[in-house]
């Protein structure tokens, strides 16, 4: 019998290893494929921009034009990569400018290739003459650049605003003696070079205006490097001004990790935020609130994620889980009533919202797979990552009015 058990265990272990190897291989293949696509898009962008400029500047040297474009692209990308290195706070202004430049570059590449594809389709359908006339090329070039500038400016202005998204959720079966608890959900603040004191003050003010009973933060409070904060003490004080009856609770996100991990925890502790690391607490004898470690942290993150142990004295109370990534939904069953997530930013900038919508079962809003599955709310986040732009998506705070049973009511 022991031999059979050992054989089964070994087979299961080998199967898991094989599955992991397959997933790793597929992930690498997908990354290589995406890299090839990106290189192709950049090459075509340079080609189209050269054609546009050559109409204005006759005798423009193609190799020189290509080298200048390539150097600009590599500089923007290199500065962004360097901004991810801890301890580079002295260059914060440069990094901020680069983040905006990255957003503009993204739209130049997207729009240029979209226009190129459109003109190709129009030629195939004989709706325009071939070769494309100089006037059509000039107009398409001007409109493309204006649109890229317009979307970048709009995205920057829109990202400075915070929207409120409201939900009404019942936990458990409807019964007498239920009460309403207002839970305010934040995520993906990304404190760093871009999100600093001014934006955090807006967040705190908006949260307090909602008069929450409890505040929950679904990860990515930091942007991976707490040393990038110009005045962490002041930011900690601002964080501490969030007011609620039952306190502020958080789980960690993939960016809440790295060399400054312990400093991040100290910051949150000093601000009165309780971080739940695969643990749970009972809130007002009304529901259990659990928080998870992130499933794929970028850098040091303390202990590894472990199985969630619900409090033994929770009894019939509904269970709410803070889990940063909605890709983990398959870990939960009918024992969980509500899962609160962030991470996706809802793609942050069009058309990336189409990608997150395709990748995740739910990348934004309310979701429930079936009548016995947990309810899920994914927020698009109160901050930004990378380019500080919001196009077709919002920086938001979620106001969730929970209708919950009260334990004392059940016992009476």
Model-derived segments and their meaning:
Residues 23-24, 30, 64-67, 71, ...:
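A broadly tuned "polar low-complexity/structure-edge" signature
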Residues 2-160, 409-411:
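Non-catalytic terminal accessory segments
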Residues 170-412:
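Soluble catalytic domains of enzymes that build or remodel membrane lipids, polysaccharides, and related
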Residues 160-173:
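Alpha-helical transmembrane signal-anchor/signal-peptide segments
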Residues 49, 128, 164, 244-246, ...:
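Generic preference for hydrophobic/aromatic residues in regular secondary structure cores
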């Amino acid at each position: 019998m022991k031999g059979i058990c050992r054989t089964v265990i070994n087979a299961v272990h080998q199967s898991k290893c094989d599955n992991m190897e397959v997933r790793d291989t597929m992930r690498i293949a997908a990354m290589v494929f995406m890299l090839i696509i990106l290189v192709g898009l950049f090459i075509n962008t340079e080609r189209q921009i050269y054609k546009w400029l050559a109409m204005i500047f006759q005798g423009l040297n193609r190799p020189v034009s290509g080298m200048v474009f390539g150097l600009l692209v590599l500089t923007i990308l290199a500065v962004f990569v360097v901004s991810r290195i801890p301890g580079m706070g002295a260059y914060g202004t440069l990094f901020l400018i680069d983040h905006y430049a990255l957003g503009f570059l993204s739209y130049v590449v997207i729009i240029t290739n979209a226009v190129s594809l459109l003109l190709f389709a129009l030629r195939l359908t004989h709706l325009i003459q071939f070769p494309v006339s100089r006037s059509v090329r000039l107009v398409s070039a001007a409109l493309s650049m204006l649109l890229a500038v317009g979307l970048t400016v709009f995205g920057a202005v829109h990202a400075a605003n915070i929207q409120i998204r409201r939900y009404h959720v019942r936990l458990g079966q409807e019964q007498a003696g239920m009460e309403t608890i207002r839970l305010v959900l934040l995520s993906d603040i990304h404190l760093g070079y871009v999100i600093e004191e001014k934006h955090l003050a807006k967040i705190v003010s908006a949260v307090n205006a909602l008069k929450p009973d409890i505040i929950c933060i679904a990860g990515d409070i930091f942007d991976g490097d707490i040393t990038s904060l110009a005045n962490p003490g002041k930011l900690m004080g601002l964080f501490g001004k969030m007011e609620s009856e039952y306190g502020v609770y958080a789980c960690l996100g993939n960016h809440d990790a790295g060399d400054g991990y312990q400093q991040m925890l100290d910051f949150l502790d000093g601000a009165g935020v309780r971080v739940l690391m695969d643990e749970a607490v009972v809130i007002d004898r009304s529901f259990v609130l659990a928080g998870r470690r992130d499933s794929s942290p970028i850098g040091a993150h303390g202990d590894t994620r472990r199985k969630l142990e619900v409090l033994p004295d929770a009894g019939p109370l509904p269970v709410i889980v803070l889990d940063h990534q909605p890709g983990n939904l398959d870990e939960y069953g009918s024992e969980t009533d509500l899962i609160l997530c962030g991470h996706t930013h809802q793609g942050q900038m069009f058309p990336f919202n189409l990608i997150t919508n395709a990748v995740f079962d739910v990348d934004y809003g309310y979701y429930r797979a079936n009548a016995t599955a947990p309810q899920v709310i994914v927020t698009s986040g109160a901050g930004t990552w990378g380019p500080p732009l919001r196009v077709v998506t919002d920086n938001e705070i979620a106001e969730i009015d929970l209708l919950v049973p009260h334990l004392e009511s059940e016992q009476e």
